[in-house]
């Protein structure tokens, strides 16, 4: 299949470029994403029914009638809906200071003056300068959207008024503000652009402050809907968003970009593919583009040299540790209304190295507290805690694969998470008691999933040097190659989106900006069904052939696909469309002659549960498969399988093909005998099966959790940590607990698939 444009990366920038080219110009666009989930930092991940939005915490300037809303409405076909956050969308907490930020900028200014009456003049000037500098930054954005002659004129106009914009935030505050408390309060949102006041340009500070002056908004149903609604317009125009596609090289001929080389991770084996198109857009960052995907020597290296040197001078940005919390109850029960909380131990925002060290010791200096479920309207309820740090603090584990970094790394994450939760508790009393499950990501996690150098998810740091330098922008020195996203625009969701707009404008040439501006004025057109047009490779129409209730909360589901799929491997999963722009992942229990067998739990009561409970035989949907990297290792070692609930599903597929199954062991956990799937499914099983019942005693079963069985039965089962591969699948809490036990017992080969 031929495409007009290839976009590398499916973050908000890449999808904006692809969506505009598809909807406004009818281009067939192929979007390639290395992760198994589209959306970049707008994607969400799920654990046992709960979901967290990894990179979207609030978005400003999307009120009805705003320019930002116009872009989202157009690209989503009007299907993306929004929830407004509380009036006090941000709260700044310091020793002796607790200030709530109103969505009314006039009221916010008055509240600041009431709190700091001696600084009234400085506060008035501050808001005036924020608006003035924001206009200066906007001129920079527009340069990337218009033809070169017009951009040169705008650049000249920008030079006349850039002194304040290119000072540091600290320099500005020290010059105009006397009160240490007010300086700290005004700089509180530096986490939204990733640099403390001494390093950040006042330009980016003003841009972010201005962005939120009218309050915060959040996508109804979660940020994953951004990618899913944008994707439909891309597919309707004949394009595709393909996941598990790692671009390893941008191909050039005679100095011009002509295609990409890809490692395709979807099937049974990783294999190389080449895609060609007249236009290539990279939305994975300038550094990855110029230093990794293109030659750094020869003619291409010479052309990209200035951009690479600029990136080297700018250095690396900031990363973070994020703690994801599932809550037992609605956080409104402890007085939380859905606004964000910025908690600080002192007025000092500086000392990155010192604060990174204290974070590792379990004493964070600051923490950002967010409640995604209250913003999205989803349940179960969730919270997120974020503290900024540098990647080098975790560098000693960088060479180890994800999930195999050992007990010291796990203990470090637990210590950090406890410290962050303690600090959050100081501003949100009662939060700790609500916590039901904890998962922690580090800069290594961000680096793994986004490929950003050092896990710096904001891209090149927004220092004064970045704003004094010639902007990277969407144009490159390589013909037919463009940049999109944050590096072509600015930090954050809206900054990356504007980078995507700029790239689309440049791809379309001199008439690009007028074409897109005209398209935005047309009413958005929804694509009501993901199967209402020809489907891209990897997606299949499916019909529900049968469903059978195996236990009170688990269904066995069989779907007939419209065609056979290519090679797959046991352990992989399928992604099922469950309606309303929502997709859910289910491990493949079996796949033969285009018949897909799944085990689906309805225990969480979410969208997937409602879909399968209400679907009748003959119901139609769309399935994407195969995906995922959970698979049997070809090691020849003994295997120990540990599963709870529908975590048995991928193992059923493994059992059907595993050699020497009689030498293997399965520990299957459930609460009662009526939930024992091993007794209700006709399938090959390992030679030793231990049924672990946590709430009932029964003959021939182990009474206790699977984590207890690992230690209590190790001798009887002759389990040797040094010669055993462990496969672990089930609820996220069980996987976390079992992994901790296995690490303590000395197991080093542990493959996990948390649900």
Over which residues does each language-model region extend?
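N-terminal glycine-rich phosphate/pyrophosphate-binding loop and immediately adjacent elements
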Residues: 2-135, 461-462
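A glycine-rich dinucleotide-binding beta-alpha-beta segment and adjacent secondary-structure elements
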Residues: 179-193, 364-368, 426-490
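Ferredoxin-reductase
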Residues: 534-619, 670-672, 693-696
